[in-house]
Each structure stands twice: as C-alpha cells, then as structure tokens.
From Swiss-Prot:
InterPro entries assigned: ATP_syn_F0_a_bact/chloroplast (IPR045082), ATP_synth_F0_asu (IPR000568), ATP_synth_F0_asu_AS (IPR023011), F0_ATP_A_sf (IPR035908)
Topology relative to the membrane: Multi-pass membrane protein
Localization per record: Cell inner membrane
Annotated source species: Helicobacter pylori (strain P12)
Annotated protein name in UniProt: ATP synthase subunit a
Gene3D superfamilies: ATP synthase, F0 complex, subunit A
Chief subcellular location: membrane
Entry's family note: Belongs to the ATPase A chain family.
Lineage: Bacteria, Pseudomonadati, Campylobacterota, Epsilonproteobacteria, Campylobacterales
C-alpha cells in the first residue's frame, strides 16, 4: 500500500480516492473565490488581484496567438485558460503543509488529459468534418497510408499518457522533494525549495496549457490555415 503523508483530509477519511477528491473540490472552491474576488469590482485601472489576473490572461493569449492565431486563441481560452489556472492552483496547494496537490494523483491528471484529448478531436471533426479530419492521419503519400494511419492513431493516444504522466510525475516528485527537505531541516523554513516548487508549479501549468493549444491547432487548422 502506498504511504501517504497525513493531511487535513485524513480527519474525515484515509481512503485514497476520498483524499484526492477532497483536494480536487477544495482547489476548485479556492480558485472560484479567488477568481471571484479578482472580477468582483472591475476597475479601468486594474489593481490587486484584477491586475494579476489580467496580466495572466494577457500572457496566455499572447503565447497562444502565436500557436493558433488570435481569434482561435480567444475562442479556446475558456478551456485552456481554466485548465492552466486550475493546474496552477492544484500545484500550489500541495506546497502548504497538511495539504496535497490533486495533480500528484495520476487518476486526476489522467482526467485532465482525457478532457483535452476528446475535446480537440471533437473540435477537429466539427470544423473539418469526420472524413476529412481522419484523412489527415493517413499522410500526404497514399501508398504509405496503411503504415501512417496506425502510427498516427498510436501517436494521438500516446498524448494521453504524455500529458497525464508528465504532470503527475513532476508534481509527485516535487512533493517528495519538499517532504525530504522538511524532514532534513524541520526547524527552519526551507525558502529555496519552496521557491523551486513555486516555479515548477507555474512551469507545469504553462506546459499543459501550451500543449492544449498545440493539439487544438493541429486539429482545427487546415493546411490553408497554417
């Protein structure tokens, strides 16, 4: 059985799925109220949380428009932006002693990966049509189609593994790193490790967001749109 560090969720249950679900919901609630606070009293000259959120949104759209174009970057921002923010908050909550990152659970990162996987295929089929979308899987050379098509299918399914395990592995490793540091220096606040984990939390949220846009671009942009 996997050893788990004691968290506040253990006051209610020691079940693995319950603990993961507890922090998934807690993170969503925290994100909702923080986001609500940032947008509750909008000002022409942004200050405080509003300024932070507007800077984040501008940064995401600035990067995304280079991948998929400004119009589509804004269209798919509700998905990519929400996932980026949620992954960030999920990563950050695990830094707090007594809390656990939902993204340190592979079952949760798998759900996020599946959401992206099914959504970009849905959008690709909706925009291009079923047959035209899957015709791209066969490649430009017809006689290579029997070889290219299964390779493309495997490649797309491997994205689920790549997305979920990359996030899970990095955050799980970060949590173990923090635990070891706290055990080694329990009498002092390890500021440097906390800064490293904060940076890694931002980086993993950024990578997940970028890959979401990349997969969407590959699905909805035709050859003429590139």
């Amino acid at each position: 059985m996997e050893h788990r560090v004691f968290t506040i969720a253990n006051f209610f249950s020691s079940n693995h799925d319950f603990i993961t679900g507890f922090f998934v919901v807690l993170t969503a609630v925290l994100m909702f109220f923080i986001s609500l606070g940032a947008s509750r009293k909008m000002q022409m000259v942004p200050m405080g949380l509003q300024n932070v959120y507007e800077s984040i949104i501008s940064a995401i759209l600035s990067v995304a428009k280079d991948i998929i174009g400004e119009e589509l970057a804004r269209k798919y921002f509700p998905l990519a932006g929400t996932i980026a923010l949620y992954v960030f908050f999920s990563n950050m909550i695990g830094i707090i002693p007594g809390f656990e990152s939902p993204t340190a659970s592979w079952s949760f990162t798998l759900v996020l990966a599946l959401i992206v996987f099914f959504y970009y295929h849905f959008e690709g089929i909706r925009v291009q049509g079923f047959f035209k979308y899957f015709a791209h899987f066969a490649g430009p050379v017809k006689w290579l189609a029997p070889f290219m098509f299964p390779i493309e299918i495997i490649s797309h399914f491997s994205r689920i593994v790549s997305l979920s395990f990359r996030l899970f592995g990095n955050i799980k490793g970060d949590d173990m790193f923090l635990l070891i540091m706290l055990l080694l220096v329990p009498w002092a606040v390890p500021v440097a490790p906390f800064m490293v984990l904060f940076f890694m939390g931002i980086l993993q949220a950024f990578v997940f967001m970028i890959l979401t846009y990349v997969y969407l671009a590959g699905a909805v942009l035709t050859d003429e749109g590139h």
